[in-house]
Amino acid sequence: MTASIKPGDRVSMTVKYERDGAIGIFTFDNPPVNPLTPSMHKQFFHAMQEFLADDQIRCGILTGAGDRAFCAGDDIKTPYKKSLNRQEELADHLWPHRNEGETPENFTWARDLVMVERYKPIIGAVNGWCLGQGFIYLMHLTDIRIASPDAQFGAPEINYGMAGVGGNTRLGRFLPPPVAMWMLLTGEPLSAEDALKHSLINEIVDKEDLLTRARQIAAMIAVHPPEAVRIEMEVFYRSLDLSKTDALAFTKHMYRMQRLGLATHGGESIGDMKFAYSTK
């Protein structure tokens, strides 16, 4: 059983979560370069659950505090629990939060986060360095991405002999294979300009305007019916793993279910069998 986060603990959080109207904002806040500790992964997981459960929140933003880094990856200087033998290693793998208590001793909450089923959009606003686990979170947990001109994206795990930790499962979907393999095998970062050229990000925005632009994009999404946004996202992501025939069939079924189950919007009822698109 996981320990819940108490509202009074928010002030000491190094992963901040705040609501701004229909937008939820996640901020990595661990100066000076926002490295991730085991506790931060747990905080992020619980904040994500709060974000997903809140029907008043239509869209999210993920960013980092300060102007040096979005996130420098896992804090390798943080002491963490190591398995004593193979039996304990297997137990830790199958039951990662056993006997954990209030403070986690390893980075296993990261796995829970990247496996979250999420159909509520999040905008990634990358200021500066985006490395390692921070880069993995950006790929797994954001849908639209903007970055400052000095942003650098990297998967330096190979430099520490840490192959296959999660970045390679998504990077090939966002970048051409030679570019993805270059990053994974050399550990060299990708500049903001190259990230834009290869469509890893949508826009390059001046650093002082980054969060403002992220809010603008989130607001553009938040005005749409949440059921439509959810279905667009679910069909898009699930179809990536389906054949063309299955993807088209799935899309058709989701479309029909939306028409049958759409809640009232703009005065039009379910019985009218109409979408609540406003006319301009």
Named regions from a protein language model:
Residues 1-21, 30, 67-69, 78, ...:
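C-terminal alpha-helix plus adjacent terminal tail
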Residues 23-27, 61-63, 123-125, 146:
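Structural motif
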Residues 26, 43-44, 62, 75, ...:
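Terminal peptide-recognition signature
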Residues 43-45, 49, 76-127, 168, ...:
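An acidic, glycine-rich surface segment that forms the CoA-thioester-binding/catalytic face
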Residues 113-226:
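Crotonase-fold acyl-CoA enzyme core
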